[in-house]
Structure formats: C-alpha cells, structure tokens
Amino acid sequence: MNNYEGIFSKETMVLVRNRMTAFFYKHFCKPIFFRYDPENVHDYMTTVGRILGSNFLTKKLTRAFLGYTNPILEQDILGIHFKNPIGLAAGFDKDALLTDILPDVGFGFEEVGSITGEPCEGNSRPRLWRLPKSESLVVYYGLKNRGCVEISSRLRGGKFRFPIGISIAKTNCSATAEIDAGIADYFKAYDTFVGIGDYYTINISCPNAFGGEPFNDKEKLEKLLSKLETIPADKPVFLKISPDLSERELDDVLEVVSRHNISGFVCANLTKKRGESGKIMDNDVPEKGGISGRAVEELSNKFIADIYKKTRGKYIIIGVGGIFTAEDAYKKIRLGASLLQLITEMVFKGPQVISEIHQGLVILLRRDGFKNISEAIGVDNRFS
C-alpha cells in the first residue's frame, strides 16, 4: 500500500504531469509558435487566456494541468498573503485582461501594465524578437497600454484570487519627455489607481520610451517621489530599476528612496547591453530595444545582492530575470529576493515552468532544512 501511495502521491503526479506538458510544448506547441511573429503569438495567447478565465470549468481544467501549491511556499509580506513566490512580471498582461486565469496557471501574483497616464500605442512594429540560442527576448513595445482611465475602471471593485500589483510608468510620447510633464503623467496614473490592487510599482526604467530614463538621476527621482507622496499611500510601493545602473547611480537611488515611503524594489528591468554579459549567443540581434531572459540573469542577481546588503535587508526585493529553473529561483532568494517574477521563461519552456520551479523550490528548501521559504531569504548574503 505504501508503495502505491508513493507512486500516486501528489508530488509524483505533478512531476509526471509537468514532464508530459513540457514534452508537448517543446515538440508540438513551440515549433508552431516560433514560426510566427512573437507579438501575434502573444496576442493570441492573451485571447486564449481570457477564454480560459471566463468560466469555472475551464479555470478548473487549467488548474488541474498547471497548478501547484505547497504550504512551505506561502508568505505574508507587507500585509499581503502570497500562496506562491512566482508572479507574472509587468509587460505581459499590459491591459490587465488575464487576472481571472493566472492563479490557475500557477502564479502567486501578477503585476499588470505598465500603465500610463494616457493610452499609448507604443513603438512601431516589429517590436518583439526571440533570441532562441540565448533564451532571451528583445522587447521594444514602448509601454503599449490602454491607459489608466480605461484599465482602472475595469479593475475597480474587482475581487481577485491572488495579489495584483499595478505597474505605473509615464506615457511614451514627446510631451512627457519634459520632466514636469512626465511627473504629472505618473501622478495621473498613480492617483487613478488609488484603492485598486495590492501594491504599486513605479517603473522608472523602461528602456524603450521617449526621453529615456531620466528618473535615474537623483534630483529628478526626488522630485517624482515627493510629488507622488502627496497622494496618501494606501498600499506598499515598489520601485522598478534598470539593471544597467552604475554602482554610483544605484547608491544615489538608494539615498533618495531612504527619504521616502518605498517598501521595496523590482530587480530588474530589461538590459540595453548586448555583448557585455556574455550571454548573447545569437548573431542577429536588433540594436533597438531591451533584452530579457538569460541575458539579464547575472545583472539581476548582482542588483539583488547589492541592494539587500547595502540596505541590510530593509527592503522587500522582487527578483526578475533569467529564472528558468528552481535553482535559478533559489539563487535569487538566497541572495535576498522575497518574491520572483518571470515572462520570458514561459515562451521558451512552456506554461508548466511555473509549477516546475515551485515544486523544485520545495525540494531545495527541504534539502537545506528550511520549514518555510522566508527562512532562505538572503542566507547567502548576510550583512555584518
């Protein structure tokens, strides 16, 4: 009887299910998807996700094929309960259309957007490219979204089954390139979303917007955060930073943030670097756009470690970039990340990768004697 219990245990069944799904994605779905323009595939999968999230039966079936939970992964952070540590990063669900299905896919939370003060069509196409050898994407969307008014009206009063983060950025247009106008745009979007979602992220690091990334400058960042703080904060606020900051620029950001009501950091956004990381294996790489996936992994890990150590663990860190396996995720956690986000990994590995990573994390945590994931945060990066 015990042998049968082992064969048919929940963990074994999930492992077998994930391997079957991964095989099917690798040999059937991925070859088809990779024949088509990646933005068209993204839009198609968004439509599929909306359909799957539209009724109880399809949500239940999705959960049966992709879901995974384990108490060892649950955390309460900043008054928010997270069933799983991996969330969907901003940039995929730009208009918050997938909130009904993502919990069943296995995500512990999601960050919608980035959302701007005005509707934005983004940059001209093509604006998304795959780098298969590098397991990376080149992204040049330019903050495409339907704007804060439309998206907030749809989300307001909604009952969500997992935490929702609202990523705020400035509209990608020439008008917001002027600092005061850019701040006013952030302010409009931030103010519009008061009372909606569980946390906010101020995205100051989009590499594809008109005017660049002016708020990496400490005087301009000070001005932005001071203006936003005139709105009474009813939720935790994170700052999403670039992985391309110099150490001095990072120190400047930390200095400014220390004077404001910021709860943590999202580390990190897309990198503009092409060959410096040594992770770009593809020959034909577009010059425009930022890069996600493996190419940003080491940069992200360095920022997680630096921020955790420099601030003595004061801030909650959400780690993003190059999380393809449980070992990748575990490394970020042990360096100081409390939560994680991904997008690119689903493109190359399939949707079951979320469950694979979560199940693998449980194995790694138990191997090292941890009773909860929170005990592993920063253990490889202790400050004196």
Predicted regions and their residues:
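A gly/proline- and charged-residue-enriched helix-loop-helix capping module
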Residues: 113-163
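Active-site glycine- and acidic-residue-rich loops that bind
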Residues: 172-186, 214, 239-259
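Glycine/Thr-rich beta-alpha phosphate-binding loop at enzyme active sites
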Residues: 59-68, 204-217, 255-313
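An N-cap/entry alpha-helix motif that binds or orients negatively charged groups
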Residues: 16-75, 136-144, 148-149
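Glycine-rich phosphate-binding active-site loops on the catalytic face of alpha/beta enzymes
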Residues: 108-120, 264-272, 322-323, 329-356
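Catalytic cores of alpha/beta
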Residues: 95-104, 245-259, 309, 313, ...
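Short beta-strand/loop segments at the ligand-binding rim of alpha/beta enzyme cores
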Residues: 79-87, 161-166, 231-245, 309-319
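C-terminal helical cap(s) of enzyme catalytic domains, especially alpha/beta-barrels
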Residues: 122-135, 275-289, 346-370
